[in-house]
Amino acid sequence: MRRVVITGIGLITPLGANAEASWAKLLRGDSGIKPIESFDVDDLPAKIAGTINELDSVEGAFRPDEWLEPKEQRKIDRFILLGLVAASQAVTDSGWLPENDEDRIKTGVIIGSGIGGL
């Protein structure tokens, strides 16, 4: 059996919703750490975090509806959606376009997460 590894990168980070946006902002010196605005932090010691931005007004924001219907999103943990999108990006980035079921079956993705429900 011949073994082949085709690599691609997929990222959903506090800097952007793909590798290109994240890398460009990183090189620019931007930080993904910002004040937490999505919930009340008055009783918490930490007031800042690196969160995934979903605001339409923000450059490079993650737009989950572009990947999965809202009804389907409610059925899975948010971290699973982020992992699936990053995996899809990685396969696309690799340039691997399997044309038959045999090649599709041989396709795999390795996912890493610093924290979350993966």
Region roles according to the model:
Residues 1-118:
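Conserved "HGTGT" condensation-loop signature of ketosynthase/thiolase-family condensing enzymes
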